[in-house]
A protein has these predicted regions:
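N-terminal non-catalytic structural scaffold regions of very large proteins
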Residues: 1-250
């Protein structure tokens, strides 16, 4: 479900977003709807699917936990496990982190599609800032506990818990795991590559670079956040509330 939905947003929703921007009055011959109307119905239909997916995952997770394979949170770790994770964070995770502060001197960085980030609303001397912490691709997504390997915790959950430590100079007002999906509907034709051939590899690399920087079509967050916090994402990514989805399951 998740990978199919990703592809649907990247290609179909991406294509509709392009059409909505170029020709707002054009109607689809099959549905009789404009691109904007189709997008509205898609967003409305997709939101409850997230809840169904999360409920299905929770059911499977409970059944796995019953037979000993248990996904943990920082709050559910035993004292010795908390000590292990604290050392693991200090020795393995912290050295490869690249936290970023968004303010008047540091513009909002480009976020690649389908890359997890910890986003934190920060406060210092009555001034709010946004903190971003990419989840490093070099780290394993899952950390298994040494004494009982059937007990594990997600790396993103560790980072979310330690966001207060990473941004220790600030008060962390809110935080969430953040993931954006970008439009990937790039039209490739003979003109793009040239009928004469040429360096296909360089042209494909250019297309892939273009794909990574295309418009955001979906924003996923791991927990409910305030409308004030959402505004950072709405304004930066130029998305509506309908494009911000609560996704409790990674």
């Amino acid at each position: 479900f998740t990978s199919n939905l990703d592809e649907f947003f990247m290609i179909r929703v991406g294509s509709l977003c392009d059409m909505a921007a170029v020709d707002k009055e054009h109607t689809d011959s099959k549905s009789g709807l404009t691109a904007k109307e189709q997008l509205h119905l898609i967003y409305k239909a997709v939101e409850p699917l997230y809840a169904r997916r999360d409920a299905a995952f929770s059911d499977v997770d409970s059944k796995l936990s019953a037979i000993g394979l248990r996904r943990l949170t920082m709050d559910s770790l035993a004292p010795d496990e908390q000590k292990y994770i604290k050392r693991y964070f200090k020795d393995i995770i912290a050295p490869v982190l690249s936290p970023q502060i968004v303010d008047s001197h540091h513009p909002f960085p480009h976020l690649e599609g389908k890359v997890l980030h910890i986003a934190a609303l920060l406060s210092h001397k009555k001034t709010e800032r946004l903190g971003l912490l990419p989840v490093p691709a070099s780290l394993p997504p899952v950390v298994f506990l040494p004494e009982t390997p059937s007990r594990y915790i997600l790396t993103e959950d560790i980072l979310l818990a330690y966001a207060d430590h990473v941004f220790e100079m600030y008060d962390v007002l809110e935080k969430t795991v953040l993931c954006v999906t970008r439009n990937a509907d790039i039209q490739v034709d003979d003109e793009t590559f040239g009928v004469e051939g040429g360096d296909f590899r360089k042209k494909m690399e250019k297309l892939l670079r273009q794909r990574r920087r295309m418009a955001v079509v979906r924003v996923e967050i791991s927990r409910p956040i305030s409308d004030h916090f959402k505004e950072y994402f709405r304004s930066r990514f130029e998305v509506s509330d309908a494009q911000i989805f609560l996704s409790r399951t990674a």
